[in-house]
Amino acid sequence: MIPACDWYESIPFADAITLIHEPWMPPFYRCNMWHIKGRDRDLLVDTGLGAYPLRDNVPLLQGRPITCLTSHTHFDHNGSTHEFADRLVHAAEAHVLADPQDDDTLFAKYTGGNRDGDMFIDHPEGWNAGTYRIPPAPATGLVAEGDVIDLGDRAFTVLHTPGHSPGHLSLWEAATGTLIAQDVVYDGPLVTECRGADIGVYVATMRRLREIEPRIVHGGHYASFGAVRFRQLIDKFLEGKGCVSHPGR
């Protein structure tokens, strides 16, 4: 059993971006949370499972104003969103953020048949899938394609990247060539068959993303990668080789 003080890990990247994750979960289930430091405020993309309070256990998230962007409302990405006062999401998934039912967040599908054990390398203390609930976190703002999140000295453009979920969001920072893709594209098996997924929409999103030339891509799971791997992953997906289903998400 892993205590709260050891549950989260923070790993700094270039351009004042830090990965926060839960290293006691396998990569497929381990959400990559991305903290971006700005002059006037910071930005956090996604909040993980929420097995333990996030802000209390990650010093980086204390003492500064933070805008929390929910890329999509699956349970592994928004378990601690309620801890933040400034909460952004796409309109298509705002109802789930406000009232996170287990079917909508895919938690019911994931934990059915005692499969929640697959989610952990080692369990958080006191974990009980039967009593786990994501607290409501109504959005304080809605964002859509083309909106800009301004941190004072840097800005990210919002990309609506549906397919994995109807309101999935990614972020693009042209100045650094950084794409925070989250679950639309990462270096692992992509999920195309789950509640809210649409393979036709997903294909259109991937074709649009293929036109971007990133320096680095930060996905919602697995390791970050560069432009060549980005194109490889999209091309493989579009060829029909990356369209796999998984019972979890």
Residue ranges, per PLM feature:
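Basic/polar N-terminal segments that are highly enriched at the extreme N-terminus
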Residues: 1-5
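Conserved beta-strand hairpin/beta-sheet module of binuclear metal-dependent hydrolase folds
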Residues: 7-60, 170-186
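Structural signal for conserved beta-strand scaffold positions within catalytic alpha/beta enzyme cores
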Residues: 12, 19, 70, 88-89, ...
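Structural motif
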Residues: 12, 60-61, 79, 153, ...
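Short Pro/Gly-enriched beta-strand edge/turn motifs at strand-loop
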Residues: 14-21, 127-132, 152-154
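A general structural motif
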Residues: 40, 63-65, 214
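Metallo-beta-lactamase
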Residues: 42-44, 49-50, 132-134, 138-141, ...
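Active-site HxH/HxHxD metal-binding segment of metal-dependent hydrolases
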Residues: 51-148, 229, 235-247
